[in-house]
């Protein structure tokens, strides 16, 4: 009996993840209001009203996508800061982790970047609280490396760096080789932060990237 319940729960979790992935892909491509729960269910291979066993509404599904992003970012950021022995290394890893989100989970990141205005106010408030905690991790580390900045300046700088990394989400095609994009985004983030990237040898990379022209929209 216990094994049956566990297997059923596992199938339910897997189906829920399929629904979230399908929703992220469709909403990123069409926009929130142009996608229906039926569209999402069909894309996820969930028949009829079965999708409502996992999400009461499209609004709840959208909120779950935002929770998925911010919870993952927050857990990873906390682990990076807690486990790192070097502030420069920690900041480099924070930048790299955010770059990884926008590159490897592009559809999910696009929804996070574009659709916050479609969340209910209570959901936006909860999201903002978690976002502040995420920013706090960056601000704490950057404050150790940039002691000349006050709290307001540190937060503005972190916002700018994250915005620079997420700017790639405005473009469907960057015109660059895929393997060059993460390096460019990391360089942009560190440029805004005013802190060079950590290297194991103790010398941060300052080599200029010749392909720094902004991509065409």
Task: Kindly label every feature range from the protein language model.
Residues 64, 78-104:
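Hydrophobic alpha-helical connector segments
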Residues 100-136, 170:
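Short secondary-structure transition hinges
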Residues 92, 96, 151-162:
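Short, well-structured alpha-helical segments
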Residues 121-146, 155-159, 183:
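Amphipathic alpha-helical packing segments from all-alpha helical-bundle domains
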Residues 15-23, 40, 65-69, 73-77, ...:
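Generic hydrophobic, amphipathic alpha-helix propensity
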Residues 7, 18, 22-60, 64:
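Helix-turn-helix
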Residues 1-3, 100, 136, 140-144, ...:
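C-terminal peripheral helix-coil segments that are non-catalytic and often amphipathic
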Residues 58, 69, 73, 98, ...:
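Hydrophobic/aromatic residues within well-ordered alpha-helical segments
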